[in-house]
Structures are given as C-alpha cells and as structure tokens.
Amino acid sequence: MSIPQIRTEAIEAVGRKILMEYDPSLLSGQPCPVPIETIIETKFDLILEFHTLRKNPKILGETIFDDGAVVLYDQIQRQYRMIAVRAGTILIDERLCDPSKLGRLRFTCAHELAHWVLHKKLYSGTGDVAAYNGNVSSDESHGIIERQADTLASALLMPLPQIKKCFYRIRIGRTDEQLIAEMANI
C-alpha cells in the first residue's frame, strides 16, 4: 500500500475547504461547535451508524470503503456477529454516546470522516477498513495514515480562524473557560 505523503498545511486547507463549502460561518462567525455528524450525513452523504464494535472497546470507529460485511459484538448475546454494510458507512462504537465521552465521540466521527476524505482511493477495492483505536500505531505506514486523519479531524473540529479568535479573546484578559467548552461542545 503506497501511503500518500500529505503536508500538515495541505490537510488543514482541506479542512477549511470542507467547512467553507458546508457553512462559511463556521470559519468566520461566532465560535460554535462544528456539527460534524450533520456534515458527515449531509455534505458527504455517508451513513453514520452506532454499534458495539468489539467486546473490548479498543476500536472506536471504522470507515467502510467497499460493500461487504463487518464483525460486531452483540452485548446481549455475548458473541460476535456479522452485518452487511454499504460502502460509505462510518461505524462508531455506541459506548462513546455516553455524555461524559462527547469529546471523544465527536473526534472519532471527524477522524473517520477524515479517512473517507483523505484515504478513500487508498482503501477502496481492497476490502480493508480504516479503524481507529485512539492510539498511535507501531506500524509506520498505519501510523502515518492515522496521524493524517487526526490532523484533518482537528482542523475540522477546531478551525484555526476560530481558535485564533478564542486565543485573542483570552489573551486580552478574558479567561472564559466556558467559551472554550462551548466551542468544543464539551
């Protein structure tokens, strides 16, 4: 698998372009939470589903590039089962829906969207899925792919123009932690 080398600045530009096309006020208006789930489902026409992905919650999300089947854990039956999935499906571990994990949920959604945007050509036709476990991989090529997805996820959820606005507000003496919490939707 040939890993595309993408500069951080280019990935951040992709994030700004996505937000600009979806709603320019996310870059220039009042800082607010980026509606990542809505962007996934409306701008990209992807399917967002919530399931228990594994018995051990190490895998937080998966992006499906080809029609096929995936293995999920059934907590009621206490066994793994297969379900059919379509290309363009993002699977998120439903345990992230706990209110205390909202930040991780939003980041995982953005991370999986980033795989779709940045790595679709890399994975399509291979039968592989991009899976996120929240850790840096020891496999160098996998680590590069995950860092790229992390970078785009960050650019989407924390657009630089809005971060700068918040920084300057705080810098001039306003230490409003609530503003930061509201912007991050946590």
Question: PLM features: what roles do these ranges have?
Answer:
Residues M1-I186:
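Active-site hotspot residues in diverse enzymes, especially metal/ion-binding acidic/histidine motifs
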